[in-house]
Regions:
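C-terminal catalytic/motor cores of large multi-domain enzyme assemblies
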Residues: 1-263
Length: 263
């Protein structure tokens, strides 16, 4: 059967995809391993739908994991390579949130930073997440846009330099942990690329309100047992601290002062 001949077209990789490609390549050099836990998040789901303000799951996990990291410095640490390898530790958490947005007909991946999520209310964190999906990208992601415009060799050099820096700017430029999820699309991405020491991902809740939560961990910094304990503590904080804050946002709760204090 004759038909149209097979043809191949080609085009240059966009600057945005080239930047993501560089981050993915650097991520492959880190010895990550996944640890998973099936969490019973029924209490969180009930408190969430009962709240008078909509709080997304991304905001909930950002707050809860930052509360865990407050107690465990290893979750605020990173590996610094060199002749004598070191471990650097930041005094506070900086979250990196992976955000997908459609720009000029193209899916774009952006990386938003949020300093000290553990010190912020769920309302404040949700406002941040909402801004990441609505505000103009040229306002929110100036540094990433500047990085994309650089030649590839220089861009990779800057990324490697930041990864191996002792400066506090390392945390604000890369983050101490990251969060990436496709739960909103009824999918999972347990092995997503990251250059942070740990990264969270969560699956959609099943009919019993159970959720598979994945923690990617840099084996140079922490081991499997520690990671498993972190996930156990994360579930406890979700069902205790986060539920308590969500209940304060319910119509039956006294959330007047909470709303007044939020920007």
């Amino acid at each position: 059967m004759s038909g149209e001949p097979i043809r191949v077209s080609r085009q240059l990789l966009s600057k945005a995809r080239a930047c993501v490609s560089d981050i993915a390549s650097l991520s492959q050099k880190i010895p990550f391993f996944p640890v998973e836990r099936v969490m019973d998040l029924g209490p969180v789901a009930f408190a969430r739908v009962s709240a008078s303000s909509r709080i997304g799951w991304a905001a909930i996990f950002l707050k809860a994991y930052a509360l865990v990291a407050r107690r465990h410095p290893v979750l605020r640490s990173w590996y610094v390579s060199g002749f004598m390898s070191h471990v650097a530790t930041c005094s506070a958490s900086v979250a990196t949130l992976a955000v997908n947005r459609m720009e000029n007909g193209e899916d774009r991946l952006w990386f938003a930073r949020l300093e000290q999520p553990d010190q912020k209310s769920l309302l404040e964190i949700q406002a941040f997440v909402t801004q990441c999906t609505t505000r103009p990208t040229e306002e929110l992601f100036k540094r990433q846009l500047q990085l994309e415009m650089l030649p590839r060799m220089l861009r990779r050099f800057i990324l490697r330099w930041n990864m191996n820096s002792f400066s506090e700017k390392r945390a604000t430029r890369i983050g101490t942990f990251s969060l990436s999820t496709l739960a909103g699309f009824n999918a999972t991405n347990r092995l997503h690329p990251t250059i942070c020491t740990t990264s969270l991902s969560y699956a959609p809740l099943d009919s019993d309100k159970r959720c598979i939560v994945t923690l990617l961990a840099d084996h140079r910094i922490l081991d499997g047992v520690v990671s498993a304990r972190v996930l156990q503590e994360l579930e406890e904080i979700l069902c205790r601290d986060v539920v308590g804050e969500l209940q304060c946002l319910s119509p039956e709760g006294d959330n007047t002062s909470t709303i007044r204090e939020s920007p």
